[in-house]
Swiss-Prot record:
The gene is Csn3. It comes from Rattus norvegicus (Rat). PANTHER family: KAPPA CASEIN (PTHR11470), KAPPA-CASEIN (PTHR11470:SF2). Keywords: Glycoprotein, Milk protein, Phosphoprotein, Secreted, Signal. Glycans are attached at T141, T146, T152, S159, T174. It comes from the Eukaryota. This is Kappa-casein. Its main location: secreted.
Amino acid sequence: MMRNFIVVMNILALTLPFLAAEVQNPDSNCREKNEVVYDVQRVLYTPVSSVLNRNHYEPIYYHYRTSVPVSPYAYFPVGLKLLLLRSPAQILKWQPMPNFPQPVGVPHPIPNPSFLAIPTNEKHDNTAIPASNTIAPIVSTPVSTTESVVNTVANTEASTVPISTPETATVPVTSPAA
């Protein structure tokens, strides 16, 4: 009984969005609603393999669309909802939709590389760069470190808490002076 209930609820959960969409969007072929007609046509698929094999470092003159991975030698019915403001008799039966991109405007030329700054082999004056001594003498400087020493005193009259007193020691550290 519980299994049947779960199956029915899953079926309802999967079909309710589709039923709600049909109720919200009734058939638009009614002539009373703004005279809008939708048509489904077949589209001619034109493959171009050079788009897939193009070098990515070439200049891009056109906006490329991705190719559909299907057989290039067959016609595929594609459901297109075309907004028709004229009679369906004026629409062509076949509309070729190429797979390769169409030019969007005037292609932009590739700039000549003459505007790039190319270094020459001319020798420049070295007097502008002052000579500096990169070897610095090593000077030892004393660095004080603090070490904590724990002294435990065995006094029966005092508490048993250990007493810690810091001791300082001077350790010479060598470092290069700038």
